[in-house]
């Protein structure tokens, strides 16, 4: 399948499927250690490398911790909620019980000053 990041389309096998933007909120899982900063949680390097890969793939548009770091918010481009859940389930922190999907909402990004 050929992904066309930023163009809202994905082409594969002669079919075209529309891509959409979503606001994805990730929350701490049951194995999160509240006594340790985010970068000192077990598996930080593996998690960070995984997330960097999602950015490089064009899946994550932007994201990071919000407020006190209890949650993260990401703008993602995907075909739908199933794709989002499937891809995020591959995060080493998901399988380790450190992070889980809190919510997924379709998001119309009308303003984008990144150029």
Regions found by a protein language model. Give the residues of each.
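Conserved, structured core segments of small domains
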Residues: 11-115
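Leucine-biased recognition of intrinsically disordered, low-complexity hydrophobic segments
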Residues: 2-4
């Amino acid at each position: 399948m050929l992904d066309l990041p930023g163009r809202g389309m994905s082409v594969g096998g002669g079919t075209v499927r529309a891509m959409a933007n979503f606001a994805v909120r990730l929350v701490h899982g049951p194995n999160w250690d509240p006594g340790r900063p985010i970068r000192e949680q077990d598996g930080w390097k593996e998690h960070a490398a995984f997330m960097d890969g999602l950015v490089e793939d064009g899946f994550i548009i932007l994201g990071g911790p919000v407020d006190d770091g209890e949650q993260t918010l990401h703008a993602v481009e995907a075909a739908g909620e199933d794709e989002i859940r499937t891809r995020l389930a591959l995060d080493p922190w998901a399988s380790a019980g450190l992070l889980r999907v809190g919510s997924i909402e379709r998001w119309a990004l009308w303003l984008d000053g990144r150029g």
